[in-house]
């Protein structure tokens, strides 16, 4: 059995994979970001309108859920792009739309499951935000709910980071089987997932200082590194020729 690769080695492989493809990776990330931004603008304006009726507000929240799912499936296309790159397969901007044009029921179903799990984790936060204030007699309840939501969200983050990767990689498994398999894969790898995420904090701070422009470089690097972590966990990475 091949030993697990360290974060430094995964990042080296990722830089090699991105060499000569950084412009394409930036374009893919920018495409997803702009679609997300412009699709959300009309509904953000609707909620920001002080004269918005209750019906309009309800429409906004329904639209937000639907858009979140659509953008999530778009993000799955971004994952597929990086999987193709890591596996030395052809990668192009059209990979972003792969999940809409191929077995869309599977990919939409998978993301709806993931979205539902995420919303369950956020439920205490939503309750606290809408029913309680951080002042007066309800402050303690609000803080407890915020803390509970933070803990649940963290659990989701560390338990299911490989779920969507599995859905895209294992056509032989149902979306529910991918869910249980993702939990099996994370065993013994939680600290690796946390470390990879923490190691990019410094770069993300620089992205904030650059008003987000730095994300064009950092996001593809992070995505490719995490993709290689997934391939390492599944045992596929050692079989991939990492030569440029």
Identify the meaning behind each predicted range.
Residues 117-146, 150-151:
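Membrane-proximal helix-loop-helix units in multi-pass membrane proteins
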Residues 2-35, 93-120, 155-208, 244:
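Interfacial aromatic "cap" segments that immediately flank transmembrane helices
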Residues 3-12, 16-87, 101, 106, ...:
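Short, small/hydrophobic-residue-rich motifs at membrane-helix boundaries and re-entrant hairpins
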Residues 45-46, 124-126, 135-136, 186, ...:
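Short, surface-exposed, polar/charged, turn-prone segments marking secondary-structure boundaries
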Residues 2, 56-90, 137-174, 204-240:
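Selective recognition of hydrophobic, aromatic-rich stretches within alpha-helical transmembrane segments
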